Structure formats: C-alpha cells, structure tokens
Amino acid sequence: MKIIYHDKNVHVFQSALFQTNSTVVETNDIILVVDPNWLPDEVGQIRHYTEGLVKASKKPVWLLFTHSDYDHIIGYNAFSDIAEGVIASRAFDENLGQEVILEQIKQFDDEYYITRPYLIDYPSVSYIVESERQVLEIGQTKLTFFNAEGHNPDGIFTIVNNVFIAGDYLCDVEFPYIYYSSWAYQNTLNKIEPLLEAFDIQLFISGHGNPTTDRDEVLRRRDEALEYIGNVRGSIRANKYFDFDKYMADKKFQFPRIMRRFHEGNLNIMRQEEFGH
C-alpha cells in the first residue's frame, strides 16, 4: 500500500483498488483513523502503523467513517478492538441498507477468494454527527463536522487541525459519482470554498486520488465537478447527447470502461430528478 502523503501529523495511505484513501491523523490528544480500506494486507499495514503510534504516544484511537459505501467501511473490524470511539453521521447509523452493504463486501471477497483476519460488520457508531457545524472536542483537539449529502445520503465533511477530510468529493481521478441526489451534491460542493477560508485549510483529502495542499486546486476540482453536473443536467433538459468519450478525453480521465457505468448511473438519477421516471 502506497503512502501518498505524509507530514509530522498526517499519513494518507492509498489502496491499489480505485486509488482509495485511508487517512491517519495524530493530534495532541487522539489518533484518528479514517475509512480504513480495501485489501487485508492494506488494512493490516494501516493497523500496524496505528499500533506504532499508540505504543509511542499512548493516545486513544478514534475511527471516522466519511460515508457508508462498502469500500469505506470494509476495514472497520480490524480496528474495533482498539477504537475508543467511532464517528459517523446519524444517517449512517440509521441506514436501513446495512445488510445490503455487508453483502457487497462479502460478494467482493467471494469474487476474489479473499479471506480476512477479522469479521465483516457494519460500524457501531458511538459519536453521532447530526447537525451542521457540530463540534467534538477531545482534550485540545476540535473536530468540526458538516453534512455532505449527494454522493450518498449519509456523508460528512470533517475538519481537524486545518485538515479537510472530504470523503468522495473532489477526487481528481473521477467526475462526481452521484448515488443519491445531484441537487444535494451541488449544494455540498457549494459549501467547500467558504470552509477553505473559515478554517484556513492546509490539506484537502478526498476519498480517492491525490490529496492537495493547494487551495486553487481544490477550487479547480470544485468548478469542474459543478460544470459536469450542470452540463449533464442541461443535456437531459434539452434532450441532447452528452459526448462522454469527448468529455473523458478532454479531462484526461484514465478509466473509461468502468467510469462509463458511473456516468450512466448519474444519467439515470438525474433523469428521475427531471422527469420523475
């Protein structure tokens, strides 16, 4: 598993699968592990690194789940025995599709003959985020949360120590993947610029692809995401063809075969939003 970013307080691990990121943040008071994922050896590497921090610092481990997509919760039980707290949104905790999500993990493991040294479970949340700008203080550490619906219905943004943990928004390797609502997604994107300023963000970490320390890069990604949503919605309203191949070539995205499936999913959701069918 690659470490694609590190400084004295933050390590971002990236899986070989979908360039999915897991983040470990050490503050003055806690070790925060975010979305530990994919393959057993990769999850084990994150666990090993976390154990080293615990041994050296004696700080408690907290888990944070940005949203409930199965790839982001797949490593939960590799850490549940050492986690003092588990953070996620109210919608995450009350998700009625928990068994469906667990089945997705089991199907993935079956397909590739993967065995794990831990049981597959849906995270048991001990600290529930249920309001905009909710704050959790642990010692001197302050975590501030914002609702981030759109990609799915239960996402949250988290800001801690000038680090913006965004979940599956503004990933530089993909356009918006919309599983819930394009309008909610758009509203979530519009929150980002004010937060960059209000919290003096020094590091932005998306759920897939590359983190960035460049605010202009964050805003460029934001603008391109809004442009994609607007253009797709416009093509649907005008009953015009959206040239996906040209879009992929223009934006230099690398994975057209699978990304076409996600684009078609976006089209289906946005057609339902426009026409109700």
Where are these regions (language model features)?
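Conserved beta-strand hairpin/beta-sheet module of binuclear metal-dependent hydrolase folds
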Residues: 2-52, 157-171
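Charge-patterned, long linear interaction tracts outside catalytic cores
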Residues: 134-140, 145-154
